[in-house]
């Protein structure tokens, strides 16, 4: 298997039609749903001004290469400065911002989005896996991640013979598959917490938003449907002679959507952080349930065909590197065209949504 770090990046085609940068609107919608937790966490940090650092160091883990990466970090800086103004604190802090993602991330495209005049803010690219150490011990005040830590460090072992014709957990998967994914998640999330616990100063904070599962039963149909439909598309292409059966049998996506109980248990067991807040929310696959005055988004314009393409393009932006590496790049347009049609059929009979979890943590 090729090095997983090279395959777990988003579609890095700069600002092309299928790039993550141009297909991350759904992530922006999801991020906006969790911003109130981020704001409350920042208010808690500023609440006790005594000892607040003159240089506030923060990190965005899994920043990718689109405009969303800068949206949250700039929002954090603006919020902190506004809170200082409200408290009549004249001397604003300086900021060091570390933008982290895997080495193949398009950092060049990301830094092109930066303003040439950053004032009191200093921004650095930080390539590397967040399942490894990224910064010196006790050097970070705040860490943030949005829709990244549900990605596993590797495909769980032992799936090839147990999960045929599926590319992720599915309702037809045997119990061994669910156990393998859960075990890999527990190991990875515990490692993640331990490493961030080493890097973040005592009393520092961390806010994480990620895909979750609405029920404890891992075979829940709605929570698995997005990848089940992609698997069915590949099965159809095997029948048409467009994909090799062995290639399908040997492919599984390294992702896991935990339930809230698993998240709470992992945080408690690892012990570096206190769980201050946990919230959940849903967003429709095509984001048609979301309206925002700034975006002037009208849910009525989401027809079935557009919804299918929107969902397929979003999934393509986050999965194409690993799919193209395994099945070949020449079938990607055909694959996601067929996938979009299956999405249309699915949404015509079911109103599916993504289930998200957001947590706010304090370093003990």
Curated annotation (Swiss-Prot):
Residues noted as binding benzoate in the record, renumbered to the chain: 27, 150-151
Post-translational note: The N-terminus is blocked.
SUPFAM superfamilies documented for this protein: S-adenosyl-L-methionine-dependent methyltransferases
EC number(s) per entry: 2.1.1.273
Xref: Pfam families: Methyltransf_7
Keywords: Magnesium, Metal-binding, Methyltransferase, S-adenosyl-L-methionine, Transferase
Function: Converts benzoic acid into the volatile ester methyl benzoates. This scent, mostly produced in a rhythmical, diurnal manner, attracts the pollinators.
Name of protein: Benzoate carboxyl methyltransferase
Organism: Antirrhinum majus
